[in-house]
Amino acid sequence: MPGIYAVDRITSKRTEYSESSPAKIRDNISSILNRPAAINGASSDLVRNIIDVLNSKGGIIARSITEDTGKAISASRKEIASALKVLRDHVKVKATDRADGSRIAYRSGVSIIYPDVWCPVLSLVERLVPALHTRKLLVVSPDSRAFTAVKMLLDEIDPLTALKAGLVVSLFADQTKTVSIMQRKRISDLLFSGSMEELAKLKHRCDCCSIRAESGEGFSIMVAEDSKLDECAISIADIFLDFSRSPFRRPATVLVEASVEEYLENRLIEEISKHNTGDPFSDSTSVGFVQNPENASTAAAILLSGKNRTHDILHWDGFHDNVFHPALVKDASASSRLRGFNDLPILKMRSMASIQDGFDQVVQSGNLMFASIWSSDPYLEELVSQALPVSSIYFNLVPSVLPVEWKNPLVNENVVQGPSALIKSMLSQKTLLRRK
């Protein structure tokens, strides 16, 4: 019987789902998006394990860890703050001369970044961690919500964490301000989220060791022509609607083989229409369609003007029900035609010539939180695990052709023994994160 497997890219563990997989996958993603900051026995044990291990060995970054079920082990900010106090003595700062005569303070030591609210924050911070312990990092974005949340999260864990780690949070107000901050604080790395035009201008004006850009793609879904299209449409609609209710709303892209594109599009419209669909310009709309890209900018301007019941609120307790969800926009060849929709959840349809072409498009999109691969090809798993830099991958595959166990070469057999064993194994190997 065909089933669906979820592969956790942190623990490399696989979870099998039954034929009711769309609902279970939806619940799994929802639990991550709306993760509570509650204290429980598992979280207390995890923090104690981190403290015990890091008391004996310094200079290590402990990554956030998920259980095999996909649900997060949640720890309170107070507990994490107590763990961070133990680590302060491990932080060392040394100045390094640059060729131009200036000096940069490189920071080494221990940083624990353990986001316990909302997967987009988790995804962002995971990308920040490799640079935090070695360089000053500037976070630049026109979207205040995501990066305000990161700063709030870091400040609540420990007010000194951002300073010690070298993280600088800045909203992308204008080129002059950004470059000024970089020069004043001697920033060596830049994580940028914005348009390609703005990125090109910024590259021209500043001198950084590295610039990592984000495209704004929340997650990508690949659909092959041999998929169960009806089941796929239900799952995509449920996942996207759950995701779009999060305060951190990002576009999603469905990459579908051309032969089944029209059918899948019609099925998606049918499924999303079941969720209180109405006129995109109506005050009572909760889900709407903007199928004509020519009208995208106009629709976005009206929605963001506040004339509709549109909310754009950062709220720790979850999301508001009364959020406008423009659900489906046919992708246009000219990206400028969709300008203005960057801050709204869009489900875009895009053709792919083949699975390999889909991989190429996914990799180029850059900012991924989930990738869902719908196909009956059993060989996709190995290929995608090497090709896609994402945190979770979902497969519609035949269980009989998959191996029973999948060991991560980094943690080996310890992966099945829980967070404590995983952290200790990571500490002993001294290579937690691959540097880019």
Regions found by a protein language model. Name each.
Residues 1-102, 123, 130, 274, ...:
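N-terminal Rossmann-like NAD(P)+-binding subdomain of aldehyde/semialdehyde dehydrogenases
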Residues 8-20, 27, 31-34, 42-48, ...:
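Conserved C-terminal structural/oligomerization subdomain of aldehyde/semialdehyde dehydrogenase
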Residues 22, 40, 175, 229-230, ...:
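Residues at or immediately preceding the N-termini of alpha-helices
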Residues 32, 65, 135, 168, ...:
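Residue-level signal for inorganic ion chemistry
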Residues 33-40, 51-65, 69, 73, ...:
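Structural signal for hydrophobic packing residues in well-ordered secondary-structure cores
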Residues 53, 156-161, 184-185, 195-332, ...:
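ALDH superfamily catalytic-core signature
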Residues 94-231, 403, 409:
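Rossmann-like NAD(P) dinucleotide-binding subdomain of oxidoreductase/dehydrogenase enzymes
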Residues 137, 312, 368:
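Residue-level detector of anion-binding/catalytic polar loops
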